[in-house]
Amino acid sequence: MKRLLSWLTGLVVMAGLLFSLATPSGVQAADIRNVADDKIAERGDKVDLNNSSVRRFQQFPGMYPTLAGKIVLGGPYESVDDVLALDLTDRQKELFEKYRDNFTVTAPSIALNEGFDRINDGQYR
């Protein structure tokens, strides 16, 4: 009797495994979207003022870290011009205007703005 029960249990387990392998993966899991990749595609080559970390401003001489920090902490923005409403020095406004065409604004994403990830994104050299 124990042997029969053991065989039946094994048969049920094997049938379950075969059924799980036979079902398509689309049935097993919903379409998973990566918010960060979607935002990268949306912004293109520009720096998104609502979702980028201060490190993205390193490519613009004079902006990192002081002006970049002010911009990151001053958001969210409706348009790129909203940055000029911040308390910036004349030099900082001049720098921002110099690189203005390199920036864009998309809707803020919780996944990219949670905690202090925009100030310290954990990337160290």
Curated annotation (Swiss-Prot):
Q: What InterPro entries does the annotation carry?
A: PSII_PsbU
What is this entry's stated membrane topology? Peripheral membrane protein
What the entry lists under Pfam families is as follows: PsbU (PF06514)
Keyword Transport included in the entry's annotation:
yes
> What keywords are annotated for this sequence in UniProt?
Electron transport, Membrane, Photosynthesis, Photosystem II, Signal, Thylakoid, Transport
Q: Where is the signal peptide?
A: 1-29
Annotated GO biological process: photosynthesis; photosystem II stabilization
Where in or outside the cell is it found? Answer: Cellular thylakoid membrane
GO cellular component annotations of the record: extrinsic component of membrane; photosystem II oxygen evolving complex; plasma membrane-derived thylakoid membrane
Q: Which domain of life is it from?
A: Bacteria
Q: What does this protein do?
A: One of the extrinsic, lumenal subunits of photosystem II (PSII). PSII is a light-driven water plastoquinone oxidoreductase, using light energy to abstract electrons from H(2)O, generating a proton gradient subsequently used for ATP formation. The extrinsic proteins stabilize the structure of photosystem II oxygen-evolving complex (OEC), the ion environment of oxygen evolution and protect the OEC against heat-induced inactivation.
Q: Which NCBIfam families match?
A: PRK02515.1 (NF002708)
The text of the family note is:
Belongs to the PsbU family.
Subunit architecture: PSII is composed of 1 copy each of membrane proteins PsbA, PsbB, PsbC, PsbD, PsbE, PsbF, PsbH, PsbI, PsbJ, PsbK, PsbL, PsbM, PsbT, PsbX, PsbY, PsbZ, Psb30/Ycf12, peripheral proteins PsbO, CyanoQ (PsbQ), PsbU, PsbV and a large number of cofactors. It forms dimeric complexes.
| Full protein name | Photosystem II extrinsic protein U
- Could you read off the lineage of the organism from its UniProt record? Bacteria, Bacillati, Cyanobacteriota, Cyanophyceae, Synechococcales
